[in-house]
């Protein structure tokens, strides 16, 4: 998917955290591409003939190109997808607010927002009381090593529960004049801080 949708620019992930996060746990093995295992799991679920679903995609190229690749991979194991290319307003209304979708692709780029998984009303509707308790405990914990352990446990929970198919961290490619100084090498937020730029 990274090669086909992003021309090789991207880093595989297996959970909601990016690899540069100090508490990142490499769980990429949980979501390896394995068509034979997929067919076996479908058969165990009583869906050996496959099924049909929707794939609603927002405008960015990672979603549109990634969606075509994923639809092809799903088709190979018997899952037919109806792709709908949506504008952002449609995606927000149908998927994010309306929760009316089978599958979607979207980049979660907000830093440290793993707590969204403790909200059953969030668009992917994960409702795990154990995870919710863990997030409540995390929010009341200040000890860095305890927080780190909790964040690692949280990543394992959502990855093992397959809340989402974690694909890759988007590359943040930019071009800047060589004379410009002070730009961040890696962006910790979605904003570009120009206060130290000269």
Residue ranges and their predicted role:
Residues 33, 58, 64-65, 86:
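Residue-level recognition of alpha-helix initiation/capping sites
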Residues 35-54:
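Immediate post-signal peptide segment of exported/extracytoplasmic ligand-binding proteins
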Residues 1-25, 62-71, 89-198:
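Detector for C-terminal structural segments
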Residues 22, 33-34:
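Positively charged, proline/Ser/Thr-rich regional signature most characteristic
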Residues 50-59, 82-84:
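Short, well-ordered beta-strand elements
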Residues 79:
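Short phosphate-binding/catalytic loops that engage adenosine nucleotides
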Residues 27-33:
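DNA breakage-rejoining catalytic core of tyrosine-based enzymes
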